[in-house]
């Protein structure tokens, strides 16, 4: 048996990774918008649903990682079992009714509870597949160079996530317009769109481990103290602290959809597609750069120095983007501002994408280090740190966003009024009644990310070589 993966295994892994990311992008890009702005659950409840579910899910990730690392099953067993349930639960997350003052209190309570229950179950099931797929390259080959190459191709999955992020909302808006444009029509349009993306994503996700061979056997520990690695392994400890300090970088994904919808597009499907693409192209370019350049850059400068550098660079374009809005609060759609915004988001997206890829490489190095230290190789546990970082960030960002909405008094009734205003031809960014909301959206999109980029670089600021 060869010591590294075949071309077919590589292709199937990337295909499955793309499918998993389509599902992930579908949920993370529009669920918060759907709950608050389509089915009109009050912002405070949406913030609690998303933050509590995400924080709970993040906290339990290391325990699921430890369970997988200690278990008798191979990673591929999880990757074969999880895709179809994940796709079904994705659809169920968008199956709620519409929250309304005209509903009875029990009905509204049921709508809120069902949103919470379906989402938290989705999080648990998704994690059971996410941890194995993140760590799968580490068991497909014992060659560190080949492993780095495959891990560096993970941005291909991110591109698939980017495509779903770009497409889901504009498609749903277009379908809603065809159906009639009411709140019920928009709800049904999202349900149909999400169903289509769930089927495509689940089908591709299923390919991940079919026919693959795990060439590196995890040295499984039978003791129950594996969580000590988060303290005793210096690399895992640093990247976990860095991730927690940088939690609010996830605000970009939380705020992007309402920012595009209400400031730039006024719920126009074509403009939603254009401006989501404008904001998203930076991430896609960054993913391409990650796949092409991270192996050589990390070899030349070291992963720790590279990680610190891209996070520090990311501070400045975020600050400049907010300053641009402060200068032109109603005119960000003018050509000069649009060009400047495109350049800034290109830099931001590139920094975020490179940072995420390098983070994965550092965790892989932490696994190798642990094997040298203790002769244990808990791949799943260590890669659960990355899912923990993502989820705790999204949870805290969702909570912060809901507090912000409450601060500007933007609740369920105000959302319905804003939707009616747009339906009657209004443009929110040009109306003084919504200036506080527009400022809040830009502020949340940029300032927490700048602060978190600085904080996440601190554990690696000394930049020692690998």
Task: Indicate residue ranges for each PLM-predicted region.
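Membrane-embedded alpha-helical bundles of multi-pass transporters/translocases
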Residues: 2-466
């Amino acid at each position: 048996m060869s010591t590294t993966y075949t071309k077919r295994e590589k292709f199937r892994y990337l295909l499955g990774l793309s499918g998993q990311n389509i599902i992930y992008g579908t949920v993370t890009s529009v669920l918060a918008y759907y709950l608050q702005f389509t089915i009109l659950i009050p912002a405070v409840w949406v913030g609690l649903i998303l933050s509590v579910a995400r924080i709970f899910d993040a906290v339990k990730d290391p325990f699921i990682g430890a369970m997988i690392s200690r278990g008798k099953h191979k990673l591929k067993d999880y990757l074969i079992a999880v895709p179809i349930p994940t796709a079904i639960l994705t659809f169920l997350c968008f199956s709620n009714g519409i929250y309304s003052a005209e509903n009875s209190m029990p009905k509204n309570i049921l709508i809120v509870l069902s949103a919470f229950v379906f989402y938290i179950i989705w999080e648990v099931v998704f994690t059971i597949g996410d941890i194995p797929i993140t760590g799968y390259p580490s068991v497909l080959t014992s060659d560190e160079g080949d492993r780095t190459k495959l891990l560096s191709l993970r941005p291909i999955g991110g591109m698939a996530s980017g495509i779903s992020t770009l497409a889901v909302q504009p498609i749903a808006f277009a379908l809603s317009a065809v159906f009639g444009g009411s709140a019920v029509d928009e709800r049904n349009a999202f349900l149909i769109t999400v169903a289509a993306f769930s089927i495509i994503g689940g089908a591709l996700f299923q390919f991940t481990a079919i026919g693959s061979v795990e060439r590196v056997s995890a040295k499984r520990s039978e003791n129950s103290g594996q969580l000590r690695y988060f303290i005793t392994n210096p690399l895992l400890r640093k990247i976990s602290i860095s991730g927690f300090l940088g939690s609010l970088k996830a605000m970009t994904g939380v705020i992007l959809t309402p920012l595009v919808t209400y400031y730039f597009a006024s719920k126009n499907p074509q403009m939603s597609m254009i401006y989501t693409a404008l904001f998203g192209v930076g991430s896609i370019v960054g993913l391409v750069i990650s796949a092409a350049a991270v192996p050589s850059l990390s070899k030349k400068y070291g992963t720790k120095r590279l990680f610190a550098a891209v996070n520090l660079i990311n501070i400045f374009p975020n600050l400049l983007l907010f300053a641009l809005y402060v200068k032109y609060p109603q005119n960000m759609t003018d050509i000069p501002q649009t060009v400047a915004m495109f350049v800034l988001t290109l830099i931001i997206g590139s920094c975020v994408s490179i940072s995420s890829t390098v983070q994965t490489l550092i965790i892989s190095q932490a696994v190798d280090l642990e094997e040298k230290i203790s002769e244990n190789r808990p791949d799943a546990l260590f890669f659960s740190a990355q899912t923990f970082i993502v989820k705790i960030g999204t949870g805290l960002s969702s909570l912060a966003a809901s507090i912000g909405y409450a601060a500007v008094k933007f609740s369920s009734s105000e959302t319905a009024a804003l939707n009616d205003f747009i339906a009657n031809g209004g443009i929110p960014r040009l109306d003084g009644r919504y200036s506080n909301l527009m400022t809040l959206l830009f502020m949340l999109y940029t300032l927490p990310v700048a602060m978190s980029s600085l904080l996440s670089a601190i554990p690696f600021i000394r930049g020692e070589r690998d």
